[in-house]
Amino acid sequence: MGNLKSVGQEPGPPCGLGLGLGLGLCGKQGPASPAPEPSQAPVPPSPTRPAPDHSPPLTRPPDGPKFPRVKNWEVGSITYDTLSAQAQQDGPCTPRRCLGSLVFPRKLQSRPTQGPSPTEQLLGQARDFINQYYNSIKRSGSQAHEQRLQEVEAEVVATGTYQLRESELVFGAKQAWRNAPRCVGRIQWGKLQVFDARDCRTAQEMFTYICNHIKYATNRGNLRSAITVFPQRYAGRGDFRIWNSQLVRYAGYRQQDGSVRGDPANVEITELCIQHGWTPGNGRFDVLPLLLQAPDEPPELFTLPPELVLEVPLEHPTLEWFAALGLRWYALPAVSNMLLEIGGLEFPAAPFSGWYMSSEIGMRDLCDPHRYNILEDVAVCMDLDTRTTSSLWKDKAAVEINVAVLYSYQLAKVTIVDHHAATASFMKHLENEQKARGGCPADWAWIVPPISGSLTPVFHQEMVNYFLSPAFRYQPDPWKGSAAKGTGITRKKTFKEVANAVKISASLMGTVMAKRVKATILYGSETGRAQSYAQQLGRLFRKAFDPRVLCMDEYDVVSLEHEALVLVVTSTFGNGDPPENGESFAAALMEMSGPYNSSPRPEQHKSYKIRFNSVSCSDPLVSSWRRKRKESSNTDSAGALGTLRFCVFGLGSRAYPHFCAFARAVDTRLEELGGERLLQLGQGDELCGQEEAFRGWAQAAFQAACETFCVGEDAKAAARDIFSPKRSWKRQRYRLSTQAESLQLLPRLTHVHRRKMFQATILSVENLQSSKSTRATILVRLDTGSQEGLQYQPGDHIGVCPPNRPGLVEALLSRVEDPPPSTEPVAVEQLEKGSPGGPPPGWVRDPRLPPCTLRQALTYFLDITSPPSPRLLRLLSTLAEESSEQQELEALSQDPRRYEEWKWFRCPTLLEVLEQFPSVALPAPLILTQLPLLQPRYYSVSSAPSAHPGEIHLTVAVLAYRTQDGLGPLHYGVCSTWMSQLKAGDPVPCFIRGAPSFRLPPDPNLPCILVGPGTGIAPFRGFWQDRLHDIEIKGLQPAPMTLVFGCRCSQLDHLYRDEVLDAQQRGVFGQVLTAFSRDPGSPKTYVQDLLRTELAAEVHRVLCLEQGHMFVCGDVTMATSVLQTVQRILATEGSMELDEAGDVIGVLRDQQRYHEDIFGLTLRTQEVTSRIRTQSFSLQERQLRGAVPWSFDPPTQETPGS
């Protein structure tokens, strides 16, 4: 990461490669040769290796102010540093003196001021920072930007200071590292983990935060960059300060002869620790305790728990005697005495850490004469001639010491980077910054490492040194001068007191970390199941984190850059698309750019559909950046989401060709953008074991997050606890409260479904099938009253909110053990335990349902017909009085295969489950809190507003079937049965959901092929009505369309036959073909058969030669078979491979010329679904045994035929 210098005690103590933050953070301690003046440096000898041909071109800035001209003498490239014009502070140099080689220029030290900062000065700095922040999130000039500026200005005027929001603090800390001119490792600036400790009040709390920081950053040797920010400086109050220059340092003991045992750089802080009660050792590598100071209090001494401090014994790969020298060094370089400045606010305690560059240890810490000074000892052991410098004994010994450091750290699996890799990464960082910001502040004297100077590329690079804000700044030691207020020596603490402090800190570590590690849980849901899972995940993560659960459409994607942990639970809608409330999130995620896909090659700008919904599933870009990611290291750019840890769970059905496609897309994009995946993608198949899959994934995700953030020592127990039925719902934690008069139905439906509802009324309901048919398909005509919210275009969907059947509701009410009065509106209240710093314990209303009677809830808001989930069965098992029923319910809830077979065979409603298990009690609060919501039913609109203004038509198949192989009870479709019984004037709650990807092309001259068997013809009725309007009212002559329809029998269910023939005669259709699957005396034919046998040439011509469109509407099985057929047609007619044809369809989808409107499983798909379920069971059982990871990409997508 960057090279860090520790500062504050004497010039020169090197700090490891920590964050490489601050002004003195690199591999140089004393001054190197001053950097040549830009554009005036002497020409070095010609390079021995040819200049790379990828050097950036010379680009002159626009006319105006003169900018520094910066040359790379190795390759000859020239750039102009325009960013330097934004420098916030003059450097230490004067017109007559260059002070660039001073380690601590007084002018650059931040000192406490007497009294508050001048208001105008602070306001100027605050405005500049707020502007930087909103520019970074691409919201500059927005209403939120202007409002935030006003808030800050008002706060500064009223109080003399202001508070940063957490996202602003994260941005500011990262920018401070990015702006640090002496840091060589800044390419990783975006990966800095920021811990907000601004709520800290005491030195004891400081120590707890610091212990957590060390534990997180050390990460068992896989070091992670981090910063912990303590409260800011306030006028008239002392500061929070860490007296140690680094969190981990070795003591230096002054001997009687004047020599030092240990690290000479730390003699002063060692003596201060002894004065404050520390009992010293006498070793060369004794870890110092910490001296921590709260405002206006004397410093307190804290000993670091030994298990927190990771150390590396040093040995050499070939010099066996090297290990006998007894050398060691600590893993974590953590600078702790620099000041963080953000927007004029100063944070005097903000320890930050990263990892070492090997030369910091091997050259500076071990070889400097004023440090451990082992150079000559090693040279003697190597039998080198130390009598003359011409033998280069110092250089030879230094190289071997550096080899030993690298070898030892790598052997111990502790993060470290060599100086060649670090400086090469800095050159890449310079290039990145030149493109992004027009320059990069850099101090040549500190960037060039203390070994191999001209062998590194930075030696030949001119640099411009200037100072931007936010920044890390030097500050005086707290025990010196004006900073020493309140630093009096306190009495020595006894060993018992010190030990107790460590014990208390250890017990608080997890609590404090949990309080500050925030987790964002995002869900995208069509039916509410993903939302339910997200809420369960929130309850689980509350055991060790500070979680919030948000719908995707409530979340600003730019916030991802400032998140530490994000969990995503999302469904996939239709043909692999995002759910409606995830569409904006998906679009914003696709627009973001990442470290591995930032080049402007066209294939890297593929849309969501072509990248994640293509038929061939081939995406060379994914394999390309994954390869780069595997090859990446700590010297590569971190990407926009460098600090993000994430995991994703997808809900879907393997009956669909793009199973969990949106979840895979989110998982892929988050990794592409630089995020770190904590757990492989989890996938839950609604056809089998979805809840079990989620439960296993959630527990694994929780454990992985706890390990990553060093919290939740009892993670496994907490996960088991949250999913225990006895823990997840307790009778005594819920109660019903009487409410005032409840709202009308439409506002309540709006509350439940989070979208505005409208009321249409029935004009007519007409059966479209023959009276001889045993089935029914109805044409429903609705009067919209010309409401603006019910305006639509042909191809859009209408969502209808049906009630449950009254008989079913009454039967269920009779089973409730404690029903409230039937006419009394009630609400559920839950007893919340409360939490430290949060609201106190008390009864809190459950916001899921509005106030309503129990009958209204069961009628309009709760799903009582879907089979109960395993989780609900587990709850019911705890309420069963008969032990046999309790055992059976528990077995069903725990055995995924048994549950799925039971659900598939019986498809039981809640009432049927209660009839099967009659001893189960049914409390009213359980019904109101645990039953899923009754979801809207979606239908394609079957009309055109131009033909029927103020009306919406629906084509609905009325569903009725018997379970248990035809021998069970008769089940009815909730919405279709209800609508079939409606009369003229009856109200219908509904809303419009646009389908912009399923609309006729704006150019009516483009040819179109429409494929829709059964009720799949519904949207096409709106298409032909719209085209008839174009022909007869507008006088247009659009290209005739081709319709491919399918039904069972020409005499029973040939829907809209007369309308279609009329439209054909009037020029809407050029061809109309019908496939009959059960027509007496005719072979069984499906729509895909007609495409293959009758329309192959036309399909190829329309799609590949004439820029035409193809529309497919129907159930998933039919749509998949049509897709396969079209793919084979394109391969055959276009003389291409099948995979190439798949890629062509992917392009057609991306261009919105291949359109699909797919609805769910139908009874016709039972055979196909059974086969998919069997395969899914096998996969899930392997997963539960650990044979496959929690995330799996299916080897092939199932594409069942019809």
Curated annotation (Swiss-Prot):
A lipid is attached at residue 2 (N-myristoyl glycine). A lipid is attached at residues 15, 26 (S-palmitoyl cysteine). Binds 1 FAD. Binds 1 FMN. Phosphorylation by AMPK at Ser-1176 in the presence of Ca(2+)-calmodulin (CaM) activates activity. In absence of Ca(2+)-calmodulin, AMPK also phosphorylates Thr-494, resulting in inhibition of activity. It is an enzyme of class 1 (oxidoreductase). FMN binds at residues 525-527, 529, 571-572, 653, 660, 686, 690. It comes from the Eukaryota. Expressed constitutively by vascular endothelium. Detected in alveolar and serosal epithelial cells as well as in endothelial cells in one day old rat. In adult lung, detected in rare endothelial cells. NADP(+) binds at residues 775, 1015, 1048, 1077-1078, 1084, 1086, 1088. Residues 15-27 have a biased composition (Gly residues). GO terms for biological process: angiogenesis; aortic valve morphogenesis; arginine catabolic process; blood vessel diameter maintenance; blood vessel remodeling; bone development; calcium ion transport; cellular response to cAMP. L-arginine binds at residues 246, 355-356, 360. Residues 1-70, 817-843 are annotated as: Disordered. The keyword Cell wall biogenesis/degradation does not apply. The keyword NADP applies. Zn(2+) binds at residues 93, 98. One of its GO terms (molecular function) is metal ion binding. It catalyses: 2 L-arginine + 3 NADPH + 4 O2 + H(+) = 2 L-citrulline + 2 nitric oxide + 3 NADP(+) + 4 H2O. This is Nitric oxide synthase 3. It comes from Rattus norvegicus. The gene is Nos3.
